């Protein structure tokens, strides 16, 4: 008999072997119907997999996050089933789960159309209605190869070639359709009813632009109809907030093919940029940072010494001149070490905080570029703190406090923290990495924050703390980082004179709050739907006259507001005031000011805020209200 321990601590006995499905059925009919898969001794398994030893078992249902991901993965296989029925010559590639959904890459003779995707979705619904069982068969390698050879699935054969150590693989049968996968998958298509195909895109085989282009069908799936409906509404709202769309509508920026991944900033967009940069400069100055500027192009030998050439070369733009090879900087850190090294440093100089709004370039694949969110040329609010090991915790705490305050100023109050650990390709010894990772754990503990850990996600020179903000749509964006680096000071020979008159290496803390300013602006646009808070808006007020009689007074109002530090636009066009109000509303200015004869005579302004009429206000009182609103946002949050 097998002893099966359930999550509540109870133990049940079964004849060996027993499956997760059988255990669920023995507990109750409701659980049997809801069982998607199981977790046996910590490992996810299919509901049909045999258990042959005493084990701890959890029944996975659609209420569990793992259950939702299994449903999504099974929906990807269902895409394959439908595609092969409708387009028999299509070749199936891969179909993984992604955040809140899934996709399947498919090789086709001609690209799919939106009408094709609609037909695929309709066929998927027909297949779900058949309520068929998904059958898993562990298949020897040679037999799996034969199956895919007979079906002409060349990409599946290539994937098998990538797994020479695998002797048998799970083959999941959706009626006549067969796909291979680690699993687990749902036992029946009844779990897949709440799905939607969402998008069609192109993708290169293995993500390499030198390879053939595939068709990628995206979709989502949920446990309930209401969850699916809520997701679709969220996606529709996200489309309305798309920073590329709003960037054009609000006249902030544009991109064009002649400069892939580079941004053309328009006056309003550059005004927004300047507000952000100047605000960050003020905050950094108050926090004890010194601003610097480093070259954008440096000799190849410099990058070899720093380790970037070995570990990051594929992402760097290179050029040559006068028989010397150069690279455009992808990061600011090595340049900051040069400033630290330019002079004899003492322990009394530490911590030294060097900040730069550094212009960097990275050779991102063209297929990965996406508006402001993924670019090739960008500016970071970068800074590096050179300190002693004893100062790591206090500097991390100070940085964490600064970061949280700034995020609140921008409207982000929900911040989560991740600790990214050593990647496979890295510089430095394991002892150095042990020391660095433990240092960041101690710093996080001192900050009093909870965090999750991400093995393999650190930079090549050190582990990093990642700060993720949650926007108005509930999406998570990784922006801030704090990285602990013992490697670069060693490679670039940074040192300081200790209290005992010895020489020692400083610890280097790489840190950013916004990350890429381009990307952060994209996040801000979508978070605020283009309706920026007063302090942040590129144009804070637009002033409109009703007739020519008020034009001079409008100019006086504008001058007084500008003298008080506000960003103002005048609209003195010879148009009806209703038209001007509607026309300016598309730019989502925080305030609209209307001036007629009455306002002119009484030295007042008629104020509208986001379509709300605030009435006629004394100009000086209104300016005081505006100043208080900004104080509340930046100081009182």
UniProtKB/Swiss-Prot annotation:
Its cofactor is Zn(2+). GO terms for cellular component: cytosol. Residues 1-61 form the TGS domain. It is found in: Cytoplasm. Pfam families: HGTP_anticodon (PF03129), TGS (PF02824), tRNA-synt_2b (PF00587), tRNA_SAD (PF07973). Residues 242-533 are annotated as: Catalytic. It catalyses: tRNA(Thr) + L-threonine + ATP = L-threonyl-tRNA(Thr) + AMP + diphosphate + H(+). Its EC number is 6.1.1.3. Homodimer. PANTHER family: THREONINE--TRNA LIGASE, CHLOROPLASTIC_MITOCHONDRIAL 2, THREONINE-TRNA LIGASE. Belongs to the class-II aminoacyl-tRNA synthetase family. Catalyzes the attachment of threonine to tRNA(Thr) in a two-step reaction: L-threonine is first activated by ATP to form Thr-AMP and then transferred to the acceptor end of tRNA(Thr). Also edits incorrectly charged L-seryl-tRNA(Thr). This is Threonine--tRNA ligase. The lineage of its organism: Bacteria, Pseudomonadati, Pseudomonadota, Betaproteobacteria, Neisseriales.
